[in-house]
Curated annotation (Swiss-Prot):
GO cellular component: endoplasmic reticulum; endoplasmic reticulum membrane
Location(s), subcellular: Endoplasmic reticulum membrane
InterPro entries: Selenoprotein_Rdx-typ, Selenoprotein_T, Thioredoxin-like_sf
Physiological role: Selenoprotein with thioredoxin reductase-like oxidoreductase activity. Protects dopaminergic neurons against oxidative stress and cell death. Involved in ADCYAP1/PACAP-induced calcium mobilization and neuroendocrine secretion. Plays a role in fibroblast anchorage and redox regulation. In gastric smooth muscle, modulates the contraction processes through the regulation of calcium release and MYLK activation. In pancreatic islets, involved in the control of glucose homeostasis, contributes to prolonged ADCYAP1/PACAP-induced insulin secretion.
Lineage summary: Eukaryota, Metazoa, Chordata, Craniata, Vertebrata
Name this polypeptide is given: Thioredoxin reductase-like selenoprotein T
Annotated EC: 1.8.1.9
Taxonomic source organism: Bos taurus (Bovine)
Amino acid sequence: MRLLLLLLVAASAVVRSDASANLGGVPGKRLKMQYATGPLLKFQICVSUGYRRVFEEYMRVISQRYPDIRIEGENYLPQPIYRHIASFLSVFKLVLIGLIIVGKDPFAFFGMQAPSIWQWGQENKVYACMMVFFLSNMIENQCMSTGAFEITLNDVPVWSKLESGHLPSMQQLVQILDNEMKLNVHMDSIPHHRS
C-alpha cells in the first residue's frame, strides 16, 4: 500500500513537471536572445518532433544577419485534450507498473477474473513492465507531437508548417524577413496625416 501511495505522489510530480515544461526542458524557461531591442521574431515549435536543432540553427544565422531582432522560441502545445490524455497515461503507466511489480491483482478488487495477459505479466514482470513503459511512452509522444514550426514577427504570422506542410529553408526565411523589414521601414517613413 505504501508503494502505491509513493507511486501516486511521484506520478503527480511528473504530471506537474510535464505540464510546466517549456522549450529548454526547465520549467518556465524560454530560449531567447536577451539583449536585442528590435522587432520580436517568435518561434513556436514541436520540441518532441526534433525541431529544436533547426530552431537553434535558424536563431544563430538570423541573430548574425539581423542583430537588432529579438528571437524567442517556445514549445507549441497540442490541444488540451491530447495534453490531458498524455498526463493520464503518464500516471496510469506508473500505477500499472507498480501493480505488476507488487503482484496485486486489480481485477479481484472489481470482482472480475484476471485476463490471461495479466497472468502473463505476473509471470514475466520485467518484460511486462518494459512493454507497458514503452507502449505508454509511444502513445504519450504521439499525443504531444504537433509537427508545428510556426514563426511570427511582432505577432504577425510569417510562416506556418501546419499550413504549408514543410519547414522553411534558410533562404526562404531570410527572404521573408528581408521583405518584412523593408515593409516596416517603408511604413515608418510614410508621413502620417492628421485630420
